[in-house]
Design a protein with these regions (language model features):
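Beta/alpha (TIM)-barrel catalytic core signal, keyed to glycine-rich beta->alpha loops juxtaposed to Asp/Glu
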Residues: 1-142, 146-150
Length: 150
C-alpha cells in the first residue's frame, strides 16, 4: 500500500485469493487489490471468484488459460475452433477475453506467441460461450488455496 500510495507501483495484486480471503483482507487493507491471479480456463470457471471480482471491480488474471494443455483434447473446443478457422488456443484465449479475464498464456515458440495475439478478428457466439462454460472439469480443478501448500 505504501508503494502504491508513493506512486512506485501501478497496482496491487494477489494470487489464488478466494472471496473469503479478500473479505478478511478488506478488514485491514486501506487499498484493496486491483488484480487477482487465479486458474481460469475453459472447464474451470471459478464462478464465485468471478462474481466477487466483478462486484468489486477487480481484474482477474487467468493463469494457465489453456488448462495446462489439457484443453487441446476437448472435442467441443476443436469443433468451435474449426467453425471459426482458428486454433483451440485462440478459442480458449478469446473465451477468456470475452469473460473480461486477462489471460496469460505461456509459450516460448515464436509462431505460437504470434498466434496468441490473433484474437481480435472473431468473436464467440453467446451459444459457444455457454457451451465452453459448461465444460466443467475437462482441464482439472484449481487447487484449493486453503488446503494446498504452495
Amino acid at each position: 500500500e505504501e508503494l502504491y500510495e508513493a506512486g512506485k507501483i501501478k497496482a496491487i495484486g494477489v494470487s489464488n485469493f478466494l472471496p473469503h480471503h479478500l473479505d478478511t483482507l478488506a478488514k485491514t487493507a486501506k487499498i484493496m487489490p486491483m488484480v487477482n491471479q487465479v486458474f481460469l480456463a475453459p472447464g474451470e470457471l471459478q464462478t464465485t471468484v468471478v462474481e466477487y471480482a466483478k462486484k468489486h471491480d477487480m481484474i482477474l488474471e487467468a493463469y494457465s488459460p489453456l488448462g495446462t494443455g489439457k484443453i487441446f483434447d476437448v472435442p467441443e473446443m476443436k469443433q468451435i475452433a474449426e467453425a471459426h478457422d482458428k486454433t483451440i488456443a485462440q478459442v480458449a484465449l478469446r473465451w477468456s477475453l470475452q469473460h473480461e479475464f486477462l489471460p496469460l498464456p505461456k509459450s516460448v515458440t515464436p509462431s505460437r506467441i504470434k498466434e496468441n495475439t490473433e484474437l481480435f478478428d472473431f468473436e464467440l457466439t453467446e451459444e459457444e460461450m455457454k457451451q465452453i462454460d459448461q465444460l466443467d472439469g475437462v482441464v482439472g480443478k484449481a487447487k484449493d488455496p486453503d488446503t494446498t501448500q504452495f
